[in-house]
């Protein structure tokens, strides 16, 4: 197969969903039927191939996205299995950035759950074409049609139903293919490997006709010629329908909806056919955004084997046998082991050593990889998540990933001096793997503080520290990661002078600080940032080589705010004027001046304390509703909605994280263990003044 053709045959897909929707089981079945796995792994037995970290097998949840390659028909499918737990949304975000398409798995009983919404919005952000697989159709209470309605109501999506279930709950035995207008039935005893087509059951004919008509109404809109044919009463062929479904899926005009039961081995092969038929190849995506290093210009780069090499590092993982592995998605060109490339973000050269194709935790050495491939590189020295690897002669930086601020933190103290050294190494390795995990030192207490996206996230980090790095540590109680911001525009003109014999220091900076939400001409790429720096220096008042010193100084000093020492976020700093000295000025002098300007200027911006607000969803039987709402209100909660779901009620509320510690026990006692909740980070908001006073006093 020529390299150009090869691109058409690749599908880079992610499988993502809410925790427990059956995502890992679906991936396991895909690996089984594509011949990569000889024994089906069951998540609840701790044997799933994709869940290869010890903690994952114990907890039955997927934490890191394992990448794996398999084949179906004549296509190569690279699958990334992503975690569904809210504490690991960063893993999902990283995966979506490098995927061309996704399969969103939904629980046929629960429908669209909070984490499904989060993943869906993340996929929207990266314009990832996707299709939906309504799983667990064999379970009691499964309702395919309600799930389809929830896709419309909750996600605002346009579902295109291309399959209907045959039988419900324990009688679920197959699907109706609305393209071929045939029923596909699985033999129970053959582990799903044997299935056959038959005529649509008589009692489902009307329903199938109704949904077939809806399908045709939606797809013919994409092609005038086919629409004319359809309106004049001519038959639209299966080939034409497939072509239009593919066109509509790639352009996100609609999302094909399929159904099945991965656990019962039903519906997986048609899902694979749909991945191949409807999800895009790298060629369909066509371009990737980035910047040409030599000119600084933003450009669209074609995805092609013949272009110079460019790849994005999207994951770092420690492999017990190979050491550090960097997963990359190659967008253009090709590499062979032994080549030297450049990390354009860090401006460091990297030599490509071992190159591996991964199958969950098995690996296959390859000598060459090209555009469209997802491979793991062993032993890179300076590359971290989000960096670009590029051809040395034609350097590009691909669009970077933005990572969310951590919302929870806790102190860790090593139990012995030996643990102290090991802990430093362990934490820096774990932080390199996971950009949503941060490590810092509290300057007042000297304690090491770790920060993450939730209690489970930090629990697993600590667990890995113990298991993989053999570090014993004492763990403090979880703390809320407060932030600070300014609420009005302020300006500061600061001069830093130091003369004590020998070379002196001189730097003058004039900086305007303003809240991000008040910046009128904010660029699109700056809208999701927490700190924006801009220089408006004209006429060389501050030479170009000193300006990075100002940005670096501000970026460092904003980590310790002016109210209670929490990081300062959501503001823009504009350098508008300054002065320098031919001999005494330096990058360091401007860095010091910027820090002092921040310390003096920020208090004039009416600074406020911010706290993380979580979106909490509680599912409860009717009889406990009153008590639960009363309790949520007492936690400074704001109820957003109340909806019936089956014979339960779903309450959605925005609640400060500070009020949610230990909520699981309260909810258990309020509902006699019958209610459940999930929690997701929503936004940062100002802390009420009486609460802010208590927080400041504790500092």
Swiss-Prot record:
UniProt xrefs under Gene3D superfamilies: 3.30.230.10, 3.30.70.240, Elongation Factor G (Translational Gtpase), domain 3, P-loop containing nucleotide triphosphate hydrolases, Translation factors
Keyword Cytoplasm annotated: yes
PROSITE patterns in the cross-refs: G_TR_1 (PS00301), G_TR_2 (PS51722)
Coiled-coil parts of chain: none
An example Gene Ontology biological process: ribosome disassembly
Location relative to the cell: Cytoplasm
GO MF entry, a single one: GTP binding
Ranges where the tr-type G domain occurs: 8-283
Residues annotated for GTP binding in this entry: 17-24, 81-85, 135-138
Keyword terms: Cytoplasm, Elongation factor, GTP-binding, Nucleotide-binding, Protein biosynthesis
Pfam families tied to this protein: EF-G_D2, EFG_C, EFG_III, EFG_IV, GTP_EFTU
Gene Ontology, cellular component aspect: cytoplasm
Protein family per UniProt: Belongs to the TRAFAC class translation factor GTPase superfamily. Classic translation factor GTPase family. EF-G/EF-2 subfamily.
Its biological purpose: Catalyzes the GTP-dependent ribosomal translocation step during translation elongation. During this step, the ribosome changes from the pre-translocational (PRE) to the post-translocational (POST) state as the newly formed A-site-bound peptidyl-tRNA and P-site-bound deacylated tRNA move to the P and E sites, respectively. Catalyzes the coordinated movement of the two tRNA molecules, the mRNA and conformational changes in the ribosome.
Record's protein name: Elongation factor G
Source organism per UniProt: Rickettsia peacockii (strain Rustic)
